[in-house]
Regions:
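Helicase P-loop NTPase motor core
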Residues: 1-27, 32-33, 182-183, 248-345, ...
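Conserved helicase core region in the C-terminal RecA-like lobe
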Residues: 27, 32, 51-57, 61, ...
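Basic/charged alpha-beta structural segments of nucleotide/phosphate-handling enzymes
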Residues: 33-188, 203, 392-430
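ATPase/helicase motor core of nucleic-acid motors
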Residues: 42-50, 56-60, 274-285, 308-449, ...
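Conserved helicase NTPase motor core
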Residues: 128-242, 290-294, 569, 579-583
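C-terminal accessory regions
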Residues: 619-671, 852-875
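C-terminal, charged and often intrinsically disordered regions of DNA end-processing helicases
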Residues: 664-753, 818-820, 865-866, 871-879, ...
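A non-catalytic, helix-rich entry segment at domain boundaries
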Residues: 738-812
Length: 887
């Protein structure tokens, strides 16, 4: 093989290395796009096109193997083999059903493991099955069957001709250099291929290098610092497995690390790793910011990004937002981007089709469909919300169906199928008809949210559910859980997209353009022949339903991972803003790695070290690089600190998903000072949303109980008296409290003036509860017992005089009404001065005077945290009750 490995001592001065003249005009492959950008920024001889990423070239050279259509077919083939192979012949003492369940649950990892084995070209005769776990034996059996049958979807092209390699290079250069002069393109040499900065090799990368080396001189470059030899040892461990000599740079160029704080920290970390503690410089203490959790860290980053957006606006949007940020973030664990995507979705490139509401529709329908019973089965109620809110199901006003579903939720909550929900809604219609005809029932039940829905609204929801069933039936009518035709399924999805999206005028043109690109994508994979289980089909949706990428819509990650440090330190800061490099997530947990970081399940180091002798250099390089990933993270931190010619900041997250974590041990050894993050309090940009104002709203008539609401809280008065015109209870806690009061009042009226006999009253309460149970379906048996016992206890304590039920006076009726409206009404000695003022009675003239139309139209309906908030029917909208009084 024609492979040469060179090191360079300073990434800012590669052009001073003796070999630079021989490589500067060659076609070059980099480990990441950030390294491409950094090298092109730093060296005038480099430009995009001459330099590109390794992965982009692999996608071009191995276009079939890397295509989504092959990935889909591979998943289907493996899924069918999992069903076909008799694993009981391979694994003793474990049922085949358990094995199949395990393999299917981890289908994606299984596919990745099989692909790895094919990319490594593993020989079955060299695998020692006795040394494998039962899952690994199953994987090997699947691999063996695919090899035995020469499955066409697992055939990786090998034995390339030089013309094919040159064609792949030319095509890639042409795609990237559309705006570059043709003379420059023609001068790109293809006799030598330069590869930059790869530490984490994949098997397909190594195959590519081997193929290139048959016709080209492959020159591999990486940075090496003799002063940090223990830190850089990880690179030597990986590259020593190549069948090529490493030629070290003769230069030991001063990287001026001591001029910057980051360089001093890098020197100290390197000294610890080398065991040379005597040279550690403790003159300046390292400062580390401690974030309590990932959300707090995301909030800190979000503020920085928002400040950058403001500067960008002032600069007439001349540059991207990241250009204006005064901190550039690098994290050992970049999962915080998942939170930032919610804050700033446009920053992370074009949203995938499946991330749009209409995309959610297809995912949710698939989640709900049960292939065995052939019905839509609700495992997660949110799936139904997604289907009704996306725009596929017709509604006159956007959000109307979800609003109706919300109101009826407690009545239908126990149903598990869409058909069952539709039946339950018809039952609700009958109940509403019965209640409407009975004045007393209407008075009592109007405060329960699902009885505050109109018959036409329920009909709309039933029609929507029927339409959802029809669409689903169209998708899955000829499906079962055995072999399903993917081609037929996705053709139907395309038909629905055309009918429900492209042909609908109300949907904006921007989203229609995305749908057109999804349809184009479906057209590209329309000939994929894949038949597999329904679960496998669900997993392929991410591959099928993605749009062809739009121009200039790539992601600009706000927080970058450590693999991107090497290129970014080379970028020239052309903005007027001084940059700080912020190295984040520096905890022991985040700086270490999991087994998943090393190999896909069920493969592990034991599989590669024990099950098969490492007979091939590619095999050795791959395994070594995966095992060295932990040390690579450590190297990346030191590299970033050493070559960052700017201010630096360090931080870690204290509370992670798996519990509390500690600062990275090397920083603890250096006696780093940990300072908890204290957010700056700045309310200037916050929206004042603690009140609402209305203008020329048509007011109805008010009574003294409306005035009581007004005294309690203007915001509550607006929602209950003006908007809803009554108190409507929406959550189970308040509804159960209300039902308790209803039972108490029924008993008081029924037994008025009669002697209290506990058993008789208890039986009466149970009878009334049984009568209500058919209407209040959210109350279970245990709840009913609690409600009856609570009502009985109240009656014994407050409704008796000399062993008899008290007569109900006008004053008592007034008190009962107050309890039904406010769920509490403290009077007399039990009430404080504020409550006495709130619940005092008023004449109608007093009500009209205080609640005049002029007053109400000029009023600011402000939230007011008070002792009655916990029983407010609007508390989940207002949210004031969830605040502490101190706050």
């Amino acid at each position: 093989m024609a492979i040469t490995i060179y090191t360079y001592s300073n990434p800012y001065e590669i052009n001073k290395e003796p070999y630079f003249a021989s490589i500067q005009n060659c076609f070059q492959l980099c480990v990441s796009q950030t390294l491409v950008n950094g090298l092109c920024d730093q060296y005038k001889d480099f430009y995009k096109g001459k330099l590109t990423t390794v992965n982009r070239f692999i996608n071009q050279l191995y276009s079939d193997w890397e295509s989504d259509s092959v990935a889909i077919s591979q998943r289907a083939a493996i899924d069918n083999l999992i069903e076909y192979i008799d694993f009981s012949m391979i694994v003793d003492d474990i049922s085949s059903e358990d094995v199949i369940t395990s393999l299917k649950r981890n289908r994606s990892d299984v596919v990745e493991s099989i692909r790895t084995m094919f990319e490594l070209g593993m020989e079955l005769g060299n695998i020692k099955s006795d040394e494998l776990s039962y899952e690994q034996k199953c994987i090997v059996e699947i691999y063996k069957e695919l090899k035995r049958t020469d499955n066409k979807f697992f055939a990786i092209k090998k034995g390339f001709k030089e013309e094919e390699i040159d064609s792949a290079i030319d095509t890639l250069i042409s795609d990237i250099t559309k705006n570059v002069e043709s003379d420059k393109i023609q001068n790109i040499r293809k006799d030598s291929i330069v590869i930059h900065g790869i530490h984490q090799f994949t098997p397909i990368m190594l195959r590519m290098i081997e193929e290139l080396s048959k016709y080209k001189l492959v020159v591999i470059l990486f940075n090496y610092q003799p002063d940090y030899k223990n830190v850089y040892q990880t690179w030597l461990d990986v590259y020593s497995s190549f069948e090529a000599k490493i030629v070290y740079s003769p230069r030991n160029l001063n990287n001026e690390s001591q001029m910057f704080d980051g360089g001093k920290i890098a020197d100290n970390i390197a000294a610890i790793i080398a065991g040379n503690t005597g040279v550690i410089d403790f003159s300046k203490q390292i400062e580390v910011t401690q974030f309590d959790n990932a959300t707090e860290f995301a909030g800190y980053i979000a503020k920085k990004f928002e400040q950058a957006e403001s500067l960008r606006k002032e600069d007439s949007y001349a540059h991207p937002a990241l250009y204006y940020m005064n901190e550039q973030f690098y994290a050992a664990n970049s999962d915080v981007n998942n939170i930032l995507k919610i804050y700033f979705p446009e920053q992370f490139g074009e949203r995938a089709f499946l991330d749009y509401p209409i995309g959610h529709f297809f995912l949710s329908v698939t989640n709900m469909w049960d292939p065995e019973s052939q019905v839509l089965y609700l495992k997660d109620f949110n799936d139904l919300y997604e289907c009704l809110s996306c725009g596929i199901i017709f509604e006159e006003k956007h959000g109307e169906l979800v609003s109706i579903l919300d109101k009826t939720r407690l009545f239908i909550d126990k149903e598990t199928t869409i058909k069952g929900i539709a039946k339950r809604l018809k039952r609700l219609k009958n109940r509403i008809d019965e209640i409407t005809e009975n004045e007393e029932k209407n008075r009592v039940f109007q405060r329960i949210e699902y009885f505050d829905v109109s018959i036409p609204e329920i009909d709309k929801l039933i029609d929507a559910l029927n339409e959802l069933n029809e669409i689903t039936k169209y998708f899955y009518d000829d499906f079962n859980d055995a072999k399903n035709d993917f081609k037929s399924f996705y053709k139907k999805i395309g038909d629905v997209l055309i009918k429900k999206v492209l042909n609908v005028e109300e949907i904006d043109s921007g989203f229609k353009e995305i749908v057109k690109r999804v349809l184009k994508r479906l057209d590209e994979v329309k000939d994929v022949e894949a038949n597999a289980s329904f679960d496998c089909l669900k997993e392929t949706m991410q591959l099928y339903l993605q749009q062809i990428p739009g121009e200039n819509r790539g992601a600009n990650w706000i927080v970058r991972n450590f693999e991107q440090i090497d290129g970014d330190v080379l970028r020239k800061n052309r903005s007027r803003i001084a940059k700080t490099y912020h190295f984040a997530c520096l905890s022991d947990v985040d700086m270490s790695i999991t087994h998943k970081d090393e190999f896909s399940w069920p493969l592990d180091i034991n599989f590669f070290e024990v099950a098969q002798a490492p007979v091939d250099w590619k095999y050795q390089v791959f395994v070594t690089s995966r095992l060295e990933y932990k040390n690579f993270r450590r190297y990346a931190l030191v590299y970033g600190l050493a070559f960052s010619k700017c201010a630096i900041k360090l931080s870690y997250i204290k509370n992670e998903i798996d519990g509390e974590s500690e600062l990275y041990y090397l920083l603890r050894i250096l006696n780093a000072k940990i300072t908890p993050y204290e957010p700056e309090v700045d309310n200037r940009g916050q929206k004042k949303a603690d009140y609402i104002q209305i203008d020329n709203f048509a007011m109805g008539a008010f009574d003294q109980y409306d005035l009581m609401r007004y005294r309690i809280c203007k915001y509550r008065f607006l929602l209950e008296s003006i908007v809803e015109e009554k108190s409507v209870y929406k959550d189970e806690f308040l509804l159960k409290k209300y039902l308790t009061i209803v039972l108490e009042h029924r008993a008081r009226k029924y037994f008025e003036g009669k002697s209290f006999v506990r058993n008789i009253v208890f039986d009466y309460l149970n009878e009334q509860m049984d009568e209500l149970r058919d209407t209040v379906l959210f109350v279970n048996y245990a709840d009913a017992i609690d409600i009856v016992r609570t009502a009985l206890a109240y009656l014994e304590k407050y409704s008796l005089y000399n062993g008899k039920f008290m007569l109900i006076s006008e004053k008592e009726i007034d008190y009962m009404i107050k309890r039904e409206i406010f769920l509490t009404a403290k009077l007399g000695k039990n009430a404080n001065l504020d409550e006495k003022e709130v619940f005092k009675n008023s004449t109608q003239s007093e009500v009209d005077l205080e609640l005049s139309e002029k007053t109400l139209n000029e009023m600011s309906y402000r939230r007011n945290l008070n002792t009655l908030c916990a029983n407010c029917s609007e508390k989940d909208i207002c949210l004031e009750s969830f605040k502490s009084k101190k706050a």
